[in-house]
Amino acid sequence: MASLDDPGEVREGFLCPLCLKDLQSFYQLHSHYEEEHSGEDRDVKGQIKSLVQKAKKAKDRLLKREGDDRAESGTQGYESFSYGGVDPYMWEPQELGAVRSHLSDFKKHRAARIDHYVVEVNKLIIRLEKLTAFDRTNTESAKIRAIEKSVVPWVNDQDVPFCPDCGNKFSIRNRRHHCRLCGSIMCKKCMELISLPLANKLTSASKESLSTHTSPSQSPNSVHGSRRGSISSMSSVSSVLDEKDDDRIRCCTHCKDTLLKREQQIDEKEHTPDIVKLYEKLRLCMEKVDQKAPEYIRMAASLNAGETTYSLEHASDLRVEVQKVYELIDALSKKILTLGLNQDPPPHPSNLRLQRMIRYSATLFVQEKLLGLMSLPTKEQFEELKKKRKEEMERKRAVERQAALESQRRLEERQSGLASRAANGEVASLRRGPAPLRKAEGWLPLSGGQGQSEDSDPLLQQIHNITSFIRQAKAAGRMDEVRTLQENLRQLQDEYDQQQTEKAIELSRRQAEEEDLQREQLQMLRERELEREREQFRVASLHTRTRSLDFREIGPFQLEPSREPRTHLAYALDLGSSPVPSSTAPKTPSLSSTQPTRVWSGPPAVGQERLPQSSMPQQHEGPSLNPFDEEDLSSPMEEATTGPPAAGVSLDPSARILKEYNPFEEEDEEEEAVAGNPFIQPDSPAPNPFSEEDEHPQQRLSSPLVPGNPFEEPTCINPFEMDSDSGPEAEEPIEEELLLQQIDNIKAYIFDAKQCGRLDEVEVLTENLRELKHTLAKQKGGTD
C-alpha cells in the first residue's frame, strides 16, 4: 500500500481535509472539524462548507430521481384500489381534527437512508476506480492480487464456513471467493463478475460529474492527497485506462445490484424517450406557424384590399409553406397518439392519456390557425381590386382637397371677421375667451382663444408628415419601414380622435353645467316669487275676512230691532274698507264700526282718525263704479258740519295710495305694506257695488271717512241710523244674487281657514254665514 506522502495516492472514507484523519461517519467528521480545527483559516472552512452544500444538492437530486421511479411503479396500483369506486372530489369538506407532525421523524430516517446509500455507492465507485486504474493485461497476477487486497481488506477464510447467500459449506470443491469491492466471502454460484467496459462507464460518468462540481483549489496533485468520490458527486475521480481485454472483476450480488442501479440512473439521465423527441419537433412546427401565420394574414388582407404593398406570388408561396407545416403538425400528433400501442408490454395508462391530450391540443391548434387563413385573390380579381382601390383613393383625395378648401375659406372668413370687429372696437371682447365650438363644423379651436385652422394642430401636421413618408417608402420598396410607419400613423390617428372626443365631451359637460345652473337660478326665482305671492295672499285674505265680515263689532250701536237686519247686511257687504294687520284682526274694530254716527255729539271712538285735508281730494279722483251710488250730493256737505272733530294723524305719503285687495289677483310687495294700514283709503274707488262714493270730493274735506251705503237715504251718512219719519217703506231689498254670491265667498273663506288651522276666523266666518242665510231667508219671506 502506498504511503500517505505519495501525491498519487487515493484514500477513501470520511477524511478530514486538514489532518486527513479517517472518521467513520459524516457526523463524526463534522464534530471533529468543529472541535479540532475551529480556529484555523476560514478560507478552508468556506471551501468545506461549499463542498458540503454541493453534496447536499447532489443527494437531493439522487433522491428525487429515486422517488420518481417509486412513484411510477406504484401509481397504477394506487389508482386501482385507493378510491374504491367513490370520487373523493364529491365529498363534503371536513373539519380538521387532531394534527400531529411526523416531519422530524421522517427527516431523521430519510437522512440516515440517504447517507447510507450515498456512502455505499461512493465507496464502490472509488474501489472500482482503483481496480481499473492500472493495466491489468500487462500486470502479473500476484501483483494484481496484492493490489486487490490493498483496495479493501478481505475477510478471513476461517471466519466464514458457509456461504452467506446460499448457505452451502465451503470445501475443496466449493472454494471461497472474495468480493473485490467489499471483501466479503461467497461461493462460486453466488459470485458476480463486472466487465471492464461497465466499470469504465461507471467511473467515467463519475469523473464527468465530479469535474462539474469540483472547486479549482482541489486537484489530484494536492500536497495532502485528494478524496476521489464524495457525497456531493456520489462518485470519485481517477485516471481511467482504456482496457481492451475481457478480464472481469469479481464481486458479490449486493455490490453488483448497487452498481447496476447506478448504471440505470446514468442511462436515464442520458436517454431521451421517443415521445419527447416527437413532441419537441411538434413544438418547433407550432412556433414556426406562429411566426408565419400573422405575416400571411397581413399580406392577404392587403392584397384583398387592392393594395400593391405585397406581391401576390410571394403571398402564395407563404401560404403553401404554412399549409405544409400544418400537415406536418397533424402527422406528428398522429404518430404520438399511436406510439407504443403495438408493444408487448403496453404503455402505462398515464402515458396513453398524455399522448391523447397532445393529439387533442395539436388538433385544436390546427383548427384555430387554419380557419384564420384568408384566401388570396386570383390575378384577374387582383387587377379589379387595384382599379377599385385607385378610384377610391382618388375620391378620397378629392374629398380631402374639398375639406382643405373649406377650412381655408372658414379661416379667411374668420380673419375678415376679426378685422371688421377690430375696426368696430370689438377685438377686446373676442380676446376674453375662446371661440365657441360648433359641432356641425367638425373642428375644435385651440385653448388660446384665437381662431386657427385645423392644420395648425401638431397631431395633424405629424399625420401629414408620416403619410408622405409612407408614400416615399412605398416608392422605394421598403416594406418593413412601411409597416412601421403605418403603425405609427394609426396610433397618431387614434390619439387625435381621442383628443377630439375628449374636447367634445368636455364642452358638452360645460354646457350642461351652465344650463343646470341657469335652470336652478330660474327655479329659485320662481319659488321666491310664489312664496311672496302666497304670503301676500294669506295676509290680505286674512285682513279682508276679519275687517269686512266681522258682524260682531256692530254691538255698540244698539239699533232698533226693525232696522237691525238691514244694518248688519249693509256692514257685511261693505267691501270698501281697508284690511288691518293680521296680528290685530280679531281685536281691532273695523273702520266703519268705530266711526261715530252723524247725530252723535260725543267724543270720537278709539282709533278714529282723520286724514289731512290735502290727501282727501285724491281719494275720489276716479269715477265710482258702484251702480247704487246716489246722485244727491248735498247731504254729505250738510252733515259734514255736524260731525265731531277727529284727531289728525301724520301719515307717510306712500301709505296714502292704496289699491283694493282682490284675493284672486297678484299684488306687488309695495301694495302689501299699504294694504295693512286701516286708516288709509284706496287711491281709486273700490269696485264694490255696495260702497257709495261721492263725485265731488271737495265737499267732504271736513267729514270723517265713512264709505257710502246704498241702503241709506241721501240725507243720512251713517248706515246704522235712519230718520224717525222714514219707515219700513224706505228700505230697499238686496238682490238675491248678490247675497248668494257673498254666501259662497264666505263658505270658501271658511274652507281655507280650516285648511290653514285658523280656528278664530272659522268661528267669525261661521257666525257671519249664519246671519247672511237668516237675512236671505227673511228677505225671501218678505218678498213672498
From Swiss-Prot:
Q: Where, per the database record, does this protein carry Phosphoserine?
A: 3, 215, 219, 226, 230, 684
**Name of the molecule in the record:** Rabenosyn-5
From the UniProt entry, list the residue stretches annotated as the region Disordered: 207-241, 390-429, 574-732
Q: Where is the composition biased (Basic and acidic residues)?
A: 390-400
Q: Where, in this chain's numbering, is Zn(2+) 1 bound?
A: 163, 166, 187, 190
Known Pfam families for this protein?
A: FYVE, NPF, Rbsn
Instruction: Provide the species name.
Output: Homo sapiens
Identify the coding gene: RBSN
Q: Which disease does its entry mention?
A: Kariminejad neurodevelopmental syndrome: An autosomal recessive disorder characterized by global developmental delay, progressive muscle weakness, facial dysmorphisms, ophthalmoplegia and intellectual disability. Myelofibrosis, congenital, with anemia, neutropenia, developmental delay, and ocular abnormalities: An autosomal recessive disorder characterized by neutropenia, anemia, thrombocytopenia, and myelofibrosis. Additional features include global developmental delay, osteopenia, delayed bone age, ocular abnormalities, and facial dysmorphism.
